[in-house]
Amino acid sequence: MLVAVLSIFVGAALAPLLVRLLGRAAGWVLGLLPLGVFVYFAQTLPQIAHGESLRQTYEWLPSLETPLSFYLDGLSLLFALLVTGIGALIVVYAGGYLAHHHQLGRFYVQLLSFMGAMLGLVVADNVFVFFIFFELTSLTSYLLIGFYHTEEGSRRAARKALIVTGGGGLALLGGLVLLGGVAGTWEFSRMLDLGASVQGHPYYLAIFILVCAGAFTKSAQFPFHFWLPAAMAGPTPVSAYLHSATMVKAGVFLLARLHPVLGGTALWTGTLGLFGGFTMLMSAWLALRYTGLKQILAYTTVMVLGLLTMLLGIGTEAAITAMVTFTVVHALYKGGLFMMAGNIDHGTGTRDLLELGGLWAAMPWTMAGGVATGLSMAGIPPLFGFIGKEVTYEAALHMHTWGLLVLVASVLANVALVGAGLLVGLTPFIGEVKGAFTRDPHEATPSMWVGPLILGIGGLAFGLYPSSIDHTLLQAAQAGILQESHEVHLALWHGITPAFIASLVTFALGGVVYAFWQGLRVSAFMEGVGAVFGWGPGEVFERGLYGGVHLSGAITRRVQNGQFRWYLCATFLSLLVLVGGGMLAGGGGAEFSFSGEIRYYEVALATLILLSIAAAVRTHDRFVAILALSVGGYGVALVYLLFGAPDLAMTQFAVETLTLILLVIVIVHLPGIQGDEPIGVRLRDGLVAAGCGALLTTIMSVVIQTSLDLRVSDYLAQKSYTEAEGHNIVNVILVDFRGLDTMGEITVLAIAAIGVYVLMRMPRQKKPSLAAGTSVAASRSDAAETETD
C-alpha cells in the first residue's frame, strides 16, 4: 500500500515533464497511474469480501511510536477504489478541459498530490499518519480551488476552504491525541474493539466534540457548509473530483472509521442525526434557488453529505447499508454531472439553466452521460440512484424511534433532489435553443465526454445488476463500519413496499417541483430557506474574518507603536509575569546562602558596575550614558575574567568595544534627551527592571542547586579534545558539534547585512507632487476597473 500511495506522488513530480513532452495527450498517460492503482486495490476485493483485512507497517519514527502503518478493510477499500477509479477519469478529463492552459503541468502536480493524500488518508492506520494526510488534503485542495489565482473570487474561496477545514483539523488533532491516550494505542485497527472503554471514559465528551468538529468542517455540515459552494470557483475538474468522491467525504470516512469506537451512544446518534438531517433537508431545497449548474450540484453535494452523516448517526444495520450504498451512488452520478457541466460551459460559454436548452444535437455524447447521471441523481429506475434512495427509506422504516420523522425528512429532501436531478440532467438538452450562446455549441473532445459516459453506464449497470456489488464490496464496507458482517441484498424490485410507496410520492412531488421550478426558486419560501441556511453562517464567517483583521490591526497599532522602550518593557514584563508567576504558582524558589570569602576587589568591581548603571539611568547626556553603559559592560567582562572564563571575557571586551564605537558614530544623529520622564513611567521601568533582575538571580540559584544530568556535558568534555582537537569546549561546540547551526546563524547575519547595505545605497526619492499622486491614483483606478471587468 505504501508503494501505491507513493506512486501517485511520483506521478505528480513527473507530470510537468510529461505535459511538456506530450501536451494535451499527457492526461491519457497520467490517467494510467491511478488506473493501475485502482486495479491493485480491486484485486484485493475477493480477500476483503471474505472478511479478511490487510495491515502493513513500516518503521518510521520508532522513538515516537509512530510507524508508517496502513490498514485495508472493506471501508478503506471502498474509498480507495472511488479515489483512484474516479481519479483516473478526472485526470483524463482535465487534459481536455485545460488543454490550452499554460499551467496544465502545475495543475496535474496539485491534482495528483491531492489524490495521493486522499488515498493515504483512507488507508492510514496510525492516527498521526492519518492526520498528516488529512491536513495535506486541505493544503492541496486550497491550491486546487485557488488555481485561477489571478481572480479574486478564486483566492477568496480557497482561503475560506483552508480556514474552515484547517481550523477543524486543529480540533481533530486534539481529539485524536485524546483518543489515542484513552485507548492506549495509536492504531485505528486496534481501537476498533475498544469502544466500550473509550465511551466510558471521562474524556469521551471532549473526544467526541473535537472529532465531530474536524469531520463536520471537512464534510461541510451545518454550520460549516458554506465553504463548499464557494469552492465552485475552482476549475471544473476540481469540483468533479473534490466534491464527488474525495475531499468532502473525508469527514464522513472519519466518522465511519470511528463508528465502532465512538458510535452507538445517545450523544452520537442525536448529534449526527440532528446536524446531518438539518444539513440534508435545508441544502436540498436551497439548491433550487440557483440557476447555475455548478451551484445546484454543490448544494446537492452538501445534501448528500448530510444524509450520509445522518445515516451514520442512526447506526443500524439498515442505515449503514444505505450509507455505503449511497456513497457509491453519489460518487457515480455527481462526478459525471460535474464533468457534464464543464462540457456544457466549454461548448457554449455558459452554465446558466435559464440560457440552456436544445443541446441534444450539438452534444450527443455529453447528453448521454448527463442524462444517465442526472436521472440517477433523481433516483429514476432502473438506475443505481433508485436503489440508493429506497435503501435510505428502508433505514428510516427500520428505526424504532423517530423513524417517521426521519422518513418524512428524507422524502422532503429527495423531492428536491429529484427536481434538481431533472433540471441538470434534462433541461440543458431538451426543448429549443433559448438564445445566442457566446460560442457555437459543439461537442467536447473524447477525453471530456468519456468520463461522464462511463459513470453513467456504471450507474445503469449497478442498477440493473446490483448483485455485482452488494455481496462483495458493499457488504465488506458495511462490515468495516459495524465490525460484524451482515448480508447486503440489493434489488431493483422488492414488490409494493412502504419504501416503494415513499418513492412514488417522491417522484410525484419531484415532478411538480421540476415543472414549477421557475416560480418556486423566487418564492417567499425559498427566500426563507436562503436566509436561514444560505446566508447566515457564511455571513458570520465573512464578518468575523473582516472584524478579526481590523481588531488585529488595532491591537498591532497599539502594541507596535514605534517606541523601542515600550517593546523592551512589554517583553520583560511578560517574562516576569509568565515565568515568575509560574514559579510562584508551582511553589518554586531558591534558598540563598553564601559561605565563601568576599574579596575587596570583587566589592570594588560590583560597586563600579552599579555606579555606571546609575549614571546611565540618571544622566541627560546621551554620550555620558553610552560611556557609563560601556564601563558597566567592561566591569562584567572583568567578572568573567576573575571567575575563570577568559575566552568569554575576551568576547565581552570585543562586543563592548564595537558597541561603543558604533554608538559614538551614530550618536551625532540622535536628538538629545528631553528632560525627565514622569515619575510613574520611571517607577514602572524601575520595578520591571528590578523584578527581572531578581527573577534571573532566582533562576540561576535554582539551576545551581538542581542536580543535572551531566551525560551530555561529560560527552562534550571528553570528545572536544580527543576527536575535535579543541581545548575550548564552547568554541568546539560552536564550530564542530553544532557547526551547521552556526553556519545558519552566520548566513542570517550576512543576509541582514546585505539588506542593510542595499537600503543604505538606495537613492532618496523626492516626495511626489500632488499632480503625480493624482496620476498614480488614476492609473490604479483604471487597473482596478479593468480587473473588475
Where on the chain are the PLM-derived regions?
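Alpha-helical transmembrane segments and their helix-start/interface "positive-inside/aromatic belt" motifs
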Residues: 23-34, 157-166, 361-370, 442-457, ...
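Hydrophobic alpha-helical membrane-insertion segments
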Residues: 31-45, 168-177, 371-378, 451-468, ...
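Membrane-interfacial helical/loop segments at transmembrane boundaries in membrane proteins
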Residues: 54-64, 187-196, 389-395, 468-493, ...
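Short aromatic-rich membrane-water interface segments that cap or initiate transmembrane helices
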Residues: 60-78, 194-208, 397-407, 488-495, ...
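Membrane-interface and transmembrane segments of multi-pass membrane proteins
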Residues: 439-578, 692-693, 708-720, 766-789
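Flexible extramembrane loops and terminal tails that flank transmembrane helices
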Residues: 584, 594-605, 614-617, 669-789
